[in-house]
C-alpha cells in the first residue's frame, strides 16, 4: 500500500514506486483523495488536474510493465473517498472506456484481454474502489444531500444526492465491475494499529488493508487438500498447517527485501502477515452445499474463525519468545479491542450442520 500527497513531486514518486513494485512481481494500491480535485485552484491561479487525470499516467505505466517479467500485467488498486469532488468522474471513468471497447470490437479491432488494440483504451490496469463513510450511508438512508469537500480547505464545494450517487456506483459496477466499495468506518473500527495511522487503502484485491507505505506477505491454503474421504473437513490438520505457514511467513520478514525505504521500515515495525484459503467454492460443491446457503456460510465462517484464532495464537506465542512487533506498545489497547471483536464474532456464530460443527469443536 502506497501513499501520495498533493504535490507534483509526490505524484511522480508514486509513478516511480509503482513501477519498481511491478518490476519485482508485486501489486500496489493507494488512495488518491489527498490530490486536489479538478474543481479547485492552483497557487498559480489555474485549475488543478484532479486525481483521475493522474490515474491515466499510472495506468499507462502499469499496462507497459510485465509483473516480475512474467506474462501477466501489473496489479493495481486505486481508491477515492466518497466525499471527493471528482467522485462522479471517478465512478464513470471505466464505464466510458467499456463503451469504447465494445464500439472498437464491433468495428473489427482486437479488443480481447491482451489483444494488440486493447492498449488504446485507458484505465484498464487497475481495480477502482470508492471509500464510503458511515456519514454517506446515513445520508443515503435518509435520502438527503451529501457534501463533497475541497482537499485544500475542507470546505464543502458542492452537494450531491446520496441516493443518486450510490445508484451511479451500482450501475457502473453492473456495467464494468467497478467501482468496488470499501466501508471506511468499519475497516478502521477493526484496525489494530490506529495510533500509528488510519487505513486509507488496500492492496489490489482488497484482502490486505493496513497502514500507508506498508506491505504484506500473503499465503493461501488449498481447502480441498483438507477434505477427507468420508466427506468431513480435517480441521486438525488444517490448523497445524496454518500454524506452520504463519510461523514461516513471520520469519521471512526478517530476510525479505522491500521496494522502498518507507515500506521496509513499516513492514519491519508492524510485521503484517496475510493468511487465507483458496478453493472454497470447490469445497462447498464437494460437500453438497450451495455457495449462497446457510450451510455454506456456516462452514466458511467456521474455517475462517479457526484459521484466525490459530494464527493469532501463534503470533502471541512468537511474541512471548522474541518480543512483540515494534509498533505494538502504542497500539496495545486498540489491538486488544480488535481481538475481543474477533472473539465476540466467533462466539455469536451459529452452527448449521455436522460439517461446520466439527470445525468449531476443533
Predicted regions and their residues:
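Core structural elements
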Residues: 246-252, 266-288
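Active-site cavity-forming subdomains of large catalytic enzyme subunits
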Residues: 1-241, 251-266, 300, 305, ...
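Short helix-capping/linker segments at secondary-structure and domain boundaries
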Residues: 224-230, 285-292
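Short, contiguous, pocket-lining structural segments
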Residues: 237, 272-276, 307
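Ferredoxin-type iron-sulfur electron-transfer modules in oxidoreductases and energy-metabolism complexes
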Residues: 295
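Short, flexible micro-motifs
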Residues: 28-32, 180, 279, 284, ...
Amino acid at each position: 500500500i502506497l501513499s501520495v500527497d498533493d504535490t507534483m513531486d509526490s505524484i511522480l514518486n508514486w509513478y516511480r514506486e509503482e513501477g519498481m513494485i511491478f518490476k519485482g512481481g508485486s501489486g500496489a494500491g493507494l488512495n488518491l483523495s489527498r490530490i486536489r480535485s479538478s474543481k479547485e485552484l492552483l497557487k498559480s491561479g489555474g485549475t488543478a488536474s484532479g486525481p483521475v487525470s493522474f490515474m491515466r499516467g499510472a495506468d499507462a505505466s502499469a499496462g507497459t510493465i510485465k509483473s516480475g517479467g512474467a506474462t501477466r500485467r501489473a496489479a493495481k488498486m486505486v481508491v477515492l473517498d466518497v466525499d471527493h469532488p471528482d467522485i462522479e468522474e471517478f465512478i464513470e471513468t471505466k464505464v466510458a472506456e467499456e463503451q469504447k471497447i465494445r464500439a472498437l470490437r464491433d468495428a473489427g479491432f482486437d479488443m480481447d484481454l491482451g489483444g494488440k488494440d486493447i492498449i488504446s483504451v485507458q484505465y484498464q490496469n487497475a481495480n477502482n474502489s470508492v471509500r464510503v463513510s458511515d456519514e454517506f450511508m446515513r445520508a443515503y438512508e435518509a435520502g438527503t444531500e451529501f457534501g463533497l469537500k475541497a482537499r485544500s480547505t475542507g470546505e464543502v464545494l458542492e452537494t450531491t444526492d446520496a441516493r443518486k450517487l450510490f445508484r451511479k456506483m451500482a450501475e457502473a459496477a453492473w456495467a464494468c465491475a467497478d467501482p468496488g466499495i470499501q466501508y471506511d468506518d468499519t475497516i478502521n473500527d477493526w484496525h489494530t494499529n490506529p495510533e500509528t495511522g488510519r487505513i486509507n487503502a488496500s492492496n489490489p484485491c482488497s484482502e490486505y488493508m493496513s497502514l500507508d507505505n506498508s506491505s504484506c506477505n500473503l499465503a493461501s491454503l488449498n481447502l480441498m487438500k483438507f477434505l477427507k474421504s468420508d466427506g468431513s473437513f480435517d480441521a486438525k490438520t488444517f490448523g497445524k498447517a496454518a500454524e506452520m505457514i504463519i510461523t514461516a511467513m513471520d520469519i521471512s520478514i526478517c530476510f525479505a527485501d522491500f521496494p522502498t525505504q518507507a515500506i521496509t521500515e513499516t513492514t519491519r515495525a508492524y510485521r503484517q502477515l496475510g493468511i487465507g484459503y483458496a478453493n472454497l467454492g470447490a469445497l462447498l460443491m464437494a460437500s453438497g452445499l450451495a455457495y449462497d446457503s446457510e450451510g455454506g456460510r456456516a462452514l466458511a465462517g467456521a474455517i475462517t474463525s479457526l484459521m484466525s484464532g490459530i494464527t493469532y495464537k501463534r503470533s502471541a506465542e512468537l511474541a512471548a519468545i522474541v518480543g512483540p512487533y515494534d509498533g505494538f506498545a502504542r497500539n496495545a489497547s486498540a489491538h486488544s479491542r480488535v481481538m475481543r471483536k474477533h472473539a465476540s464474532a466467533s462466539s455469536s456464530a451459529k452452527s448449521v450442520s455436522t460439517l461446520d460443527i466439527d470445525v468449531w469443536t476443533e
